[in-house]
Amino acid sequence: MFEAIYAGAESGGATPPWDYGAPRPQFVEWAEARSLAGGGHAALVVGCGYGADAEFLARLGFRTTGFDFAPTAIAAARRKYPASEVDYHVADVLDLPGEWQGRFDLVVESLTVQSMPPEQHAAATRSIGALVAPGGTLLVLATTRDEESELTGPPWPLTRAEIEQFADGDLILGRVERIEGGAWWRAELSRPGEGPTSSP
């Protein structure tokens, strides 16, 4: 589905509805509120699309990796940012490279899980959580769904219980906000310990 949407956009069709053409404002607001600075820490953007969030992190000084399931999206990101320092990859969130596990001081997940069928949500949250290094942070952005509301999609917005599923293993759920008039979740999780670098 995602490859078809990106390929259609490349052929003159509609821009993917999740693409802002700029870093996602809910992410930028979070970063600015904590004066986020990379300092050479390793960061990863899940489902990076055309790369706006990944490039934002690189400008803040992170050693940034971005991946997307759609090859057309990654090719477009590389064309858009020819001098980029971001390490772009085509990858499946349900089958990520083993060497990525526990490697990243900051992981940003924005709208990827909710774009997947609900029966894949639990596996996707586990896979994403496993990327976080000791001492690292996971930021989750998703649109909201109340437990009693009808489940229709795509996309399939996340309930509070699904946000809590990211706290798998030793990942600790910290602040959870309902922002944008309650339409969005913004959740922050952390993994205890000290990695090769301190947490951003």
Locations of regions flagged by a protein language model:
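Short catalytic micro-motifs in class I SAM-dependent methyltransferases
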Residues: L111-S115
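A conserved beta-strand element that flanks and buttresses the S-adenosyl-L-methionine
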Residues: V108
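Class I (Rossmann-like) S-adenosyl-L-methionine-dependent methyltransferase catalytic domain
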Residues: M1-W100, M116-P200
